[in-house]
Design a protein with these regions (language model features):
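N-terminal signal peptide c-region/cleavage motif recognized by signal peptidases
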Residues: 23-25
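C-terminal capping alpha-helices of c-type cytochrome domains
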Residues: 17, 73, 82, 91-111
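Detector for the c-type heme attachment site
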Residues: 46-52, 107-108
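Bacterial N-terminal signal peptides that target proteins for export
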Residues: 2-14
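Gly/Gly-Pro-rich "capping" loops immediately C-terminal to redox-active cysteine motifs
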Residues: 33-36, 51-79, 88-92
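The canonical Cys-X-X-Cys-His
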Residues: 41-49, 102
Length: 111
């Protein structure tokens, strides 16, 4: 008798836990995506939305460039080995993990 009562109330809490777990995982992924998009948005003033510039043909597009190349260039700007009007200062504001994330994000964008 006690086992039947236990078996009756057990499924609803398990379902609730499963739903909460799935929601938490989705929320964490959404937060990660939002954080990455916010980080990439800092590039939009010059390089355009999603890395496709429209206003200044002298500014290179970032969409679709290889991640390895972007990492190398950002680190060169950061170290002062590559010069540009503002990129040397801007690159200093990113840590290596953020540079890697930005490079992967823009590499995944269609040209």
């Amino acid at each position: 008798m006690k086992l039947r009562r236990f078996a009756r109330w057990l499924p609803p809490p398990l379902v609730a836990l499963a739903i909460l777990g799935a929601a938490a995982a989705a929320s964490a992924q959404d937060a990660k995506t939002l954080n990455l998009r916010s980080l990439a948005a800092t590039c939009a003033n010059c390089h355009g939305t999603a890395g496709r510039p429209v206003a200044n043909p002298a500014v290179p597009g970032l969409a679709g460039i290889p991640a390895v190349y972007m990492v190398e260039q950002m680190k060169a700007f950061k170290a002062g080995a590559r010069t540009a009007t503002v990129m040397q200062q801007l690159a200093k504001g990113y840590n290596d993990a953020q540079i890697d994330q930005l490079a992967a994000y823009f590499a995944a964008q269609p040209k």
